[in-house]
C-alpha cells in the first residue's frame, strides 16, 4: 500500500494561521512487510529518525499503540524547514498509516481534528488532508474550516537552499498589535478571501501583498522576498508572498506567464530551486 500527502502553503499573506493551500509536491510512504521493529527508509537525511521516534511512526502509534511494526519506505519532494508544510505532511501520513493498518475508519473531519491537535492549528493540516484551499480557525479546542476551489493560476515556488525553522521565524513576531492595525489587517484578509471566492486573483493578489500580520516582521529573515516581489510584479504576476514562515516565496501568476517568471527567478543570484507547481485537489490519499 502507498500513502501520499501533499505539501501545503499557509497564510497567503494576510490569511495568517488560517488560510492554507495544497500543492503538487508530495510525501509518499510505501508500507512494506511486517517486521520485528519499525524501520523507515527515507531520502531526507539531516538527522531524521529511521525508527519509531520518526514523526510518522510516532503519530501512528499514538493513535494505535498496538500496531504491528512494518518496514516503511518514504520518498519526499517536500524540503524540510522551507515553509511548505513538511511537518504537517508527516503528521497526516502518520494518521493515514494508523488509519490504514488498524482499520480505524476515520472520517476526513476526524483526521483534520487529530492533525490540528498535534500541529496547533489547521492552516497546513486541513489542506493536506482535504486538498485545495482551506480557510480555518481553532477556537476553544474546536476546528472550524471551509474548503473551496482556488482560482486557476500558475504557482511558482522559489525555494532557497537554506533552512528557516518555524520557531525562529515566529520569534520575530510581536506579542500584540495596536487595535487599529489589527482591524486593518483583518479587513485586508477579509477582502483577499472574498476576492478568491469571486475568482478575482488581481484583487486577491493586491491584498496578499498588503499583509500586516507577519511579513514585515519576517522580512529581516527573508531578505529575498522584496527582490522576488519586484521581479514578479514587473512581469505581471498577481502577487508574491511568504509560504508559511518562509523562506520559500510563492508567486501567483496568470498561467501564460509561468515559464517566463520561472526563468527570470532562476537568474537571481540566490541559491534556490524554482519550481512550477499547481494546486493539489485531492489531499491525502491511500493507494491499495
From Swiss-Prot:
Q: Which InterPro entries match?
A: GHMP_kinase_C_dom, GHMP_kinase_C_sf, GHMP_kinase_N_dom, GHMP_knse_ATP-bd_CS, Homoserine_kinase, Ribosomal_Su5_D2-typ_SF, Ribsml_uS5_D2-typ_fold_subgr
What's the top EC group for this one? transferase
Query: Could you tell me the superkingdom of the organism this chain comes from?
Result: Bacteria
User: What Enzyme Commission number(s) does the record list for this chain?
Assistant: 2.7.1.39
Report residues binding ATP: 79-89
One Pfam family linked to the record: GHMP_kinases_C
Instruction: Give me any GO biological process, just one.
Output: threonine biosynthetic process
Keyword set includes Transferase: yes
Catalytic activity field: L-homoserine + ATP = O-phospho-L-homoserine + ADP + H(+)
Q: What is its main location?
A: cytoplasm
Record's subcellular location: Cytoplasm
Q: Which Gene3D superfamilies match?
A: 3.30.230.10, GHMP kinase, C-terminal domain
Alphabetized UniProt keyword annotations:
Amino-acid biosynthesis, ATP-binding, Cytoplasm, Kinase, Nucleotide-binding, Threonine biosynthesis, Transferase
Kindly state one GO CC term assigned in the UniProt record: cytoplasm
In what pathway does it function? Amino-acid biosynthesis; L-threonine biosynthesis; L-threonine from L-aspartate: step 4/5
Q: Which GO terms describe its molecular function?
A: ATP binding; homoserine kinase activity
Q: Which family does it belong to?
A: Belongs to the GHMP kinase family. Homoserine kinase subfamily.
Per the entry, what this protein does is: Catalyzes the ATP-dependent phosphorylation of L-homoserine to L-homoserine phosphate.
What name has this protein been given in UniProt? Homoserine kinase
Organism of origin is: Listeria monocytogenes serotype 4a (strain HCC23)
User: What gene is this protein a product of?
Assistant: thrB
Amino acid at each position: 500500500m502507498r500513502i501520499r500527502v501533499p505539501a501545503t502553503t499557509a497564510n497567503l499573506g494576510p490569511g495568517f494561521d488560517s488560510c492554507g493551500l495544497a500543492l503538487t509536491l508530495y510525501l509518499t510512504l510505501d508500507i512494506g512487510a511486517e517486521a520485528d521493529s519499525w524501520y523507515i527508509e527515507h531520502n531526507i537525511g539531516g538527522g531524521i529518525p529511521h525508527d519509531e521516534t520518526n514523526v510518522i511512526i510516532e503519530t501512528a502509534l499514538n493513535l494505535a499503540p498496538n500496531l504491528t511494526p512494518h518496514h516503511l519506505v518514504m520518498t519526499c519532494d517536500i524540503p524540510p524547514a522551507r515553509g511548505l508544510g513538511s511537518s504537517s505532511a508527516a503528521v497526516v501520513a502518520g494518521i493515514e498509516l494508523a488509519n490504514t493498518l488498524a482499520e480505524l475508519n476515520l472520517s476526513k473531519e476526524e483526521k483534520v481534528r487529530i492533525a490540528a491537535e498535534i500541529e496547533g492549528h489547521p492552516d497546513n493540516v486541513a489542506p493536506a488532508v482535504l486538498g485545495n484551499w482551506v480557510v480555518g480557525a481553532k477556537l476553544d479546542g474546536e476546528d472550524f474550516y471551509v474548503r473551496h476551489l482556488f482560482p486557476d493560476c500558475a504557482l511558482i515556488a522559489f525555494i532557497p537552499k537554506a533552512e528557516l525553522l518555524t520557531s525562529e521565524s515566529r520569534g520575530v513576531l510581536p506579542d500584540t498589535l495596536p487595535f487599529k492595525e489589527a482591524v486593518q489587517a483583518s479587513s485586508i484578509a477579509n477582502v483577499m478571501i472574498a476576492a478568491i471566492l469571486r475568482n478575482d486573483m488581481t484583487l486577491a493578489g493586491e491584498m496578499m501583498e498588503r499583509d500586516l500580520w507577519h511579513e514585515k516582521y519576517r522580512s529581516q529573515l527573508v531578505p529575498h522576498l522584496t527582490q522576488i516581489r519586484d521581479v514578479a510584479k514587473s512581469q505581471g504576476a498577481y502577487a508574491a508572498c511568504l509560504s508559511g514562515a518562509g523562506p520559500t516565496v510563492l508567486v501567483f501568476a496568470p498561467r501564460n506567464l509561468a515559464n517566463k517568471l520561472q526563468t527570470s527567478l532562476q537568474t537571481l543570484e540566490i541559491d534556490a530551486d524554482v519550481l512550477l507547481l499547481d494546486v493539489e485537489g485531492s489531499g491525502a490519499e491511500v493507494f491499495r
